[in-house]
Amino acid sequence: MRLVDELGLQSVWGADHLLPFAGPDDGACFETLTSLSAMALVTKRARFGVLVNGVVYREPAILAKASAQVDQMSGGRLEFGIGAGWAEREFRAYGLPFPDVAERFARLEEAIEIIVSLWTRPRTTFEGRYYQLHDAPLVPKPVQSPHPPITIGGSGWRTARLAARFASRLNVVGSPAKAAMAFERLQRCCEEAGRAVEEVELSAHPKVAIATSQARAEELALGQAEALGETFPADGSGWIVGSPPQAIAQLQRYAEVGVSHVVLGLGHPFDAELLRLLATEVLPGLS
């Protein structure tokens, strides 16, 4: 985390999982909100967040309160990410109910309404199908006004509609083609919601393997894919792989389809040299 600050990178993001989302399920997997608290204390400049909090893991009022405290601890550097959740094996392992996708999205909509209300109003009363609050205060409020930026994760119509209503950013995992499709959906949903599409940033989350040579980068990518239990796609879809100049060209393709924010997925184990290449040779070359 300190290296992110030292290199001048804009932000660092974690994932919200109860088990490793690939490989053996007994590997290390750190709790998200606890990790954010540590990030708040060991960084001074970089922003940080979760891509994204799974809505069914925690009651929305508890998530709102914990996130507000992290924003306080960091002096207003929290990026708040939230989504419907998808990793069924984690729910089963921990004895949590795993609703169908329609219910998860309905819960997501209610949860965002609750969280924004708790952050911005003195007290909140909410009577929803899934959540109920009764004259609930939340103190202290987040530092950021009116509240921390909200990122909603997903590429379908339901997430686009929610992003158009509530979010500062819509994040999509995958290729430039997938990002382009998500941007078209976001534009239509913003029009329906009476909101300027410029108010909602489109973010992409490709995996990344960058090295001084193409051969070494491909070697890193294959190793990362194997660790994730995946097959590296023949066309490299959803990956940034190559030398710094090649990485710049691949990232520009995202910009061409409306992406203005990229969260690069680093592999395991952590590679400090890759991070330095990003900071010193890739990001300065992006227009």
PLM regions: where:
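Active-site-adjacent structural elements that line small-molecule/cofactor binding pockets in enzymes
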Residues: 1-287
